Amino acid sequence: KGQSCLYYSFGYFESIFLRLKGVPYAYEISDIAYGFPSFGKARPLLRAIDRNLVKNAQFTLLTSEGFKGFLNQPKARFIVQPNKVNRKIIGVERKPLNLKDDHFIFSFVGSIRYASMMRFARTIGKYFPQHEFHFHGVANVESTQKAIDDMMELYPNIKLFGDFKNPDDFEHIYNSVDVVVVTYGVESLNETILDPNKLYEGIFFCRPLIATKGTFLAEQIESYGCGISIDSSTEEAIRDSLRLLTIEQLNNISRKEYEIEREEVFDSMDNLSTLLEEICKKRKN
């Protein structure tokens, strides 16, 4: 009947199945399955179900502290395990910025699919010819790729470098840019409360980050002192914020990132392993 097993669920609907089956389960949440705008009216009901799932799980692993605040279930047993940097590159040398002139290379590293990132790049192209914007990654749909191609045709300071190998290419990528752009929008719930690995990559490579105000990521950046948050809803708002950026400000942020211990930003399974061992001992007894 499954009572002698601990099932590990990686999803919302899988956890519903295990809950109905009445077997012990652990629940991992890496995004909110009903966090997209199309779920708007049904979200209160789906959230109520989710709160019941985490309450009855042996434990719930969250990849963002922001999920914990959203679920607001004090009776649940949570463990927060953000997607941090792969330990494969833990020995890589960290190089703080030493900018000397008003030429900044802004970059987005990852799957290119966010309208807010495209807006940021377009703003650099249109208003800041002295700067550059680099895309490192692949567009997820043809229309996004066409939009990038159109921008590159209009603005020579926008560049696309394509796919990369994670984490092997990170040292080359991050050492070739100055600022990491993580201006995820606020249109989707998931974008508002996620804690992306780009935060920890930026910190490790001592590159200041720019996030969108009103997001959990912006709170994290403020807590670490590793960047700034802006209104990214329009090109004009982005332009006005970027005009205030200075060489000294970026260099100071980079030096502060360098002071953060590297262990702080790398993946560790210690907490999860300890918890699983504890649960297994209890079940044997």
Listing of model-derived features with the role each one plays in the protein:
Residues I16-L20, Y27, A33, K41-L62:
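Membrane-proximal helix-turn-helix segments that form the acceptor-binding/catalytic region
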Residues G137, Q145-S176:
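Nucleotide-activated donor-binding/catalytic signature segment of Leloir-type glycosyltransferases, i.e.
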Residues A115-S116, N166-I173, V180-E201, A211-E219:
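Nucleotide-sugar-dependent
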Residues S232-R239, I247-K281:
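A charged, aromatic-enriched C-terminal amphipathic alpha-helix characteristic of glycosyltransferases
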Residues L61, L97-S116, F120-G125, F133-G137:
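Conserved donor-binding/catalytic core segment of Leloir-type glycosyltransferases
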Residues K1-E14, P24-A26:
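Short N-terminal targeting/anchoring amphipathic segment
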Residues Y34, R51-V92, S111-Y114:
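Donor nucleotide-sugar binding/catalytic pocket of nucleotide-sugar-dependent glycosyltransferases
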